[in-house]
Amino acid sequence: MTEPRFEPLAPLDEHNLKLESNVAPRHWKNPEPSGKYNLVVIGGGTAGLVAAAGSAGMGAKVALIERQMLGGDCLNVGCVPSKAVIASAHAAAGVRDAGKFGVEVDGEVKVDFGAAMERMRKLRADISPHDSAQRFTDLGIDVYLGSASFTGPNTIEVDGKTLTFSKALIATGARAAAPPLDGLDEVEYLTNETVFSLTELPPRIGIVGAGPIGCEMAQTFARLGSEVTLFTSSSGVLPKEAPDAGTIIGAHLVHDGVTILDSGSNLSLKSGGGGSIECRDKRDPGAPAVVVDKLLVAVGRAPNVNGMGLEEAGVAFGKSGVEVNDYLQTTNKRIYAAGDVCSRFQFTHAADFMARTVIRNALFKGRSKMSGLVIPWATYTSPEVAHVGPTSKELDSRKDEFDEFTVDMSSVDRAILEGDTDGFVRIFVKKGSDKIEAATIVAKNAGDLISQVSQAMTAGIGLGTIAGTISPYPTQGESIRKAGDLYNRTKLTPFVAKLFRKWLEWTR
């Protein structure tokens, strides 16, 4: 069988062949450029696809260039495959925990890892037509498959063809970064770009990094049957989230069988027998090594900025990616950037709305600002962790500016009934008002619940108003309304309470 051209396409079964035919067709013929483009998009991930489709839908002449697979990380090696595998792991955990609900399951729960991964590949392929080369061609877009390079301030070369543009968008995304660990270059390791090509469950897997990807995959592999060791930094689990959120997730990882070690940058790696990898903490060289069969490195992302001739176009860039202003313009005002290549908000939904900002600003002389976007995010562990607004560290450094209201999920009836009481809803408001500035949620469906808060922030709806919003009973959404009740109680000052008492005495 023909070898896959890109790692995410392994194994090259019927599902990945379908995926390839949609997002990286082998015999694609690039069009001939005809005149100047309103917009040339480099990168066919979320930001690039949204910008291309949206611009073409408004009548713009658009070119879309992708050097690997349309759909980018989200479809091929990120959101889509990870959530499919997480769903399988969640199902396995649900069966194991069935006894808590009075449901007896005879015998040991058996997981067919190969079948779970095939399910993922099938679902990914089923979703892929939405991001296909043919779909975007049918939208009137010139789709070029190949490597793009700027040759001047308003020209790009791809496949030996020169494209001239009025505006361009750099949406090349980011890739997995390699941390400076001793021995890492000498061992074979997985990243998010390769882990979903596994067909057999690793008996023992080590995961470096306790951010969202590391935590999601640690819990997933443990629930599917691997012996998992999670190597964290001294900052612990989910270090960018609230400390108590990280504590809750850490406890759940341990409950699922994950061993957590704070080796961090002190980790030293060495190839062992039979393809295994020996992991040691340099601080304790005499201690026995942790031996794993596979190693997943999930520490940070590096923007894709090299090899595009950015210097020729006058586009400044650095380790953090392409430099942009609040309107997402680069140092060449004809050229914009969106998505992971230029933003600290490395999420699919953030890339989507950054692309919409670019459409308004690049094609219609708009003045939409990146800083005006309300961008939530979520980590899909069990329970989930979601946040919107300034980070936990930023909030802590400005705590005098906010009032916070916390509702424990143990006080929410639906969470009690379903056994999901570990977690909380915490909402921050501007001191002296009910204007919502940020929120952290740890709950079964925190990724869904946070949308209520981000919608309120976008629409300018205050926490006091949310208190008057009726939720069906019993739902976990009541937790947000309860936070509103806490806010309203602060308005019952001793003076107001005294007036109420006097009134009630008088009207008795």
Language-model features, listed with the residues they occupy:
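Flexible, glycine-rich terminal cap/loop adjacent to redox cofactors
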Residues: E7-L12, I42-G44, A56-Q68, D73, ...
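FAD-site-proximal beta/loop scaffold in flavoenzymes
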Residues: D185-P202, A289-F364, S451-Q452, A467
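Beta1/beta-strand and adjacent pyrophosphate-binding region of the FAD-binding site
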Residues: N30-A47, L201-G211
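Glycine-rich flavin
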Residues: T2-Y37, A53-A60, I65-L201, S234-L238, ...
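N-terminal Rossmann-like FAD-binding beta1-loop-alpha1 element of flavoenzymes
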Residues: Y37-L64, G214-R223
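Glycine-rich dinucleotide-binding loop and its adjacent helix/turn
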Residues: K18-H27, C79, T172-E227, F231, ...
